[in-house]
Regions:
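TOPRIM metal-binding catalytic domain and adjacent DNA-binding surface shared by DnaG-type primases
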Residues: 1-59
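Structural alpha-beta junctions
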Residues: 121-122, 144-146, 167-175
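Short, aromatic/basic amphipathic alpha-helical patches
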Residues: 139, 160-172
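Acidic beta-strand-to-loop metal/phosphate-binding motif
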Residues: 146-156
Length: 175
């Protein structure tokens, strides 16, 4: 049982390492996104350093706490989102802006970009409600107990975002 688990974890790490290498090449080859990309224009947000693939999909990066590129999320013109196959996502984020006294944490890129544009404050893209807890933990570890972390969850009818935000807040002392 333990051997099988160790083998699965080793395979996952290998797959994630391969994906990270591939993603790095794709990210480097991509062009800078412009404000007229259909997704950005529809959301009314700046590119914030996002890139585009050769076929026009927006690429937004997922970094580890130490700044290592782990994966990308591809966003089509109509807003369909897909992660790069095999890439790590848990605890990975993208920091928009320079961290200061307060860091916001949002579920998705559009929400984070809107917050960053409206406040001028740093906002981490967690990419999903379920990633709010690990991202908050990674930021708490990186910036310490005194860092003001503010979670901005989606207000979905299901309440999923709020539940994960409450868990992250309770576990890591975020607001």
């Amino acid at each position: 049982m333990a051997e099988a688990k160790a083998a699965r974890e080793a395979e996952q790490e290998r797959s994630q390492a391969v994906a990270a290498t591939t993603v790095d090449a794709i990210w480097t080859a991509g062009g800078a996104a412009s404000a007229d990309h259909p997704y950005l224009a529809r959301k009314g947000i700046a590119a914030n350093g996002a890139r585009v693939t050769g076929d026009g999909r927006l690429m937004v990066p997922l970094y580890g706490a130490e700044g290592d590129l782990a994966s990308v999320q591809y966003i089509s013109a109509d807003g369909e989102k897909r992660y790069h196959p095999g890439g790590a996502t848990g605890g990975k984020f993208w920091m928009l802006g320079e961290p200061s006294a307060t860091i916001y944490i949002a579920e998705g890129f559009a929400t984070a970009a809107t917050i960053h544009q409206a406040t001028g404050k740093a906002c981490a893209v967690a990419y999903s409600a379920s990633n709010l807890v690990p991202v908050t933990g990674a930021l708490r570890e990186r910036f310490g107990a005194q860092q003001d972390l503010v979670i901005v969850a989606d207000n979905d009818a299901s309440g999923v975002g709020q539940r994960y935000a409450e868990q992250a807040s309770a576990k890591y002392g975020a607001r």
